[in-house]
Amino acid sequence: MAEFISAPLALAAEQFAKLPGIGIKTAQRLAYYMLNLPQHEVEEFASARGGVQLCRCCQNFTDREVCEICSDENRDKGVICVVESPKDVSAFERSGGYEGVYHVLHGLLSPMDGVTAEDLKIKELMGRLSDVREVIMATNPTDEGEATAVYLSRLIKPMGIKVTRLAYGLPAGSALEFADDVTLMKALENRSTL
């Protein structure tokens, strides 16, 4: 028996299904929910996207020309932490241990997927390095993250700027038996003196 879905519901479900981790059934549930909302709540939801832009400096999402982090006078502008996405900025900020600024690439190099340097915010990064002492490569430890970090390092090091990479290791509170081989190898390579 075929399921009847009206055109507006199908369109809404199709859009929700584009979100990461949302399958067709969840997308349909979200679409039903959204279509039952009062119109003003739907408009508030839609307007949330309207006020978002990229920070002129770091390319993070913001509601102003220069984000709060870049405009914070207490931040060390001489250290830039390069990340893949705005979600990574949020993760670092939750940790509370970083006092520099960020640069969001909005992706990683991935020749297999057709993502090249021109598709990322690399030109913007290179344009803000004049007074920078250190660039921290905080891309994910995937093939694409490593390739992006190496590519950027080769561009930045000739400028006399220190380029570092996040250490790899074991997550706090985890057991060795659950760590994968690469994590254990990197943890051994990056061990520190007590």
Could you describe each region identified by the protein language model?
Residues 67, 92, 146-149:
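Short glycine-/acidic-enriched loop or helix-start segments at secondary-structure transitions
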Residues 2, 20, 48, 60, ...:
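Conserved phosphate/pyrophosphate-binding and hydrolysis machinery centered on Walker-type P-loop NTPases
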Residues 27, 72-139:
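Extended interfacial segments that mediate partner engagement and assembly in macromolecular machines
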Residues 2-10, 18, 26-89, 193:
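Cys/His-rich Zn2+-binding cysteine-cluster or related metal-binding knuckle/ribbon modules and their
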Residues 98-99, 126-136, 140-194:
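Long C-terminal interaction/binding lobes of large macromolecular proteins
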Residues 19, 37, 48, 61, ...:
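Conserved, well-folded catalytic cores of nucleic-acid-processing
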